[in-house]
């Protein structure tokens, strides 16, 4: 059985994240989607909120389980979950180079775990949570980029109800 871990900040979860999770679900027997905390980022939503958005967006995919493990090293979590693959989404060459570095470090820390990079479709290749939050701050409709609950919560959080 191949178990994959798809970690992310998901602040908030985007259609690109959902696309990556769905692709992973087609490739692996079990996929853990985990809202984690990157200590170099400042978050708009709590870990609980980010997890709830992911659970809602992915609820109809039977081999995906959404968890919240905000502060843990990814490879340690992969071992806890018995995952032998870490899945990451890649939108562009900058993402690729960043993920290549992280994959190298992870391989050193956990030689038994492989990283699989899944490339986004052209429709999602420019969608970044940070960009979507910026659009929403200026009262732009971001519903085409986010799952429904995440879009509504973002609008409410920024008081553009």
From Swiss-Prot:
Residues that hold ATP according to the record: 9-10, 17, 89-91, 99, 124-130
EC number(s) reported in the record: 2.7.7.3
Catalytic activity, reaction form: (R)-4'-phosphopantetheine + ATP + H(+) = 3'-dephospho-CoA + diphosphate
Biological pathway: Cofactor biosynthesis; coenzyme A biosynthesis; CoA from (R)-pantothenate: step 4/5
Transmembrane intervals: none
Domain of life: Bacteria
Pfam families to which the protein is assigned, alphabetical: CTP_transf_like
Keyword Nucleus tagged: no
A GO-annotated cellular component: cytoplasm
InterPro entries xref list: Cyt_trans-like (IPR004821), PPAT (IPR001980), Rossmann-like_a/b/a_fold (IPR014729)
Leading EC class: transferase
Site feature: Transition state stabilizer: 17
Subunit text: Homohexamer.
Listed name of the protein: Phosphopantetheine adenylyltransferase
Species per Swiss-Prot/TrEMBL record: Lactobacillus acidophilus (strain ATCC 700396 / NCK56 / N2 / NCFM)
């Amino acid at each position: 059985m191949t178990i994959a871990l798809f970690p992310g900040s998901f602040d908030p979860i985007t259609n690109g994240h959902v696309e990556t999770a769905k692709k992973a679900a087609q490739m692996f027997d079990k996929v853990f989607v985990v809202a984690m905390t990157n200590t170099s980022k400042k978050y708009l939503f709590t870990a609980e909120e980010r997890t709830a958005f992911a659970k809602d967006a992915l609820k109809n995919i039977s081999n995906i389980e959404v968890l919240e493990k905000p502060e843990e090293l990814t490879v340690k979590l992969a071992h806890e979950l018995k995952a032998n693959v870490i899945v990451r989404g890649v939108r562009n060459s900058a993402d690729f180079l960043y993920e290549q570095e992280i994959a190298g470090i992870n391989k050193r820390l956990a030689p038994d775990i492989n990283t699989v990079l899944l490339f986004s479709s052209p429709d999602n290749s420019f969608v970044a949570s940070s960009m979507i939050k910026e659009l929403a701050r200026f009262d732009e409709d971001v519903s085409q980029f986010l799952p429904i609950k995440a879009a509504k919560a973002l609008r409410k959080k920024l008081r553009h109800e």
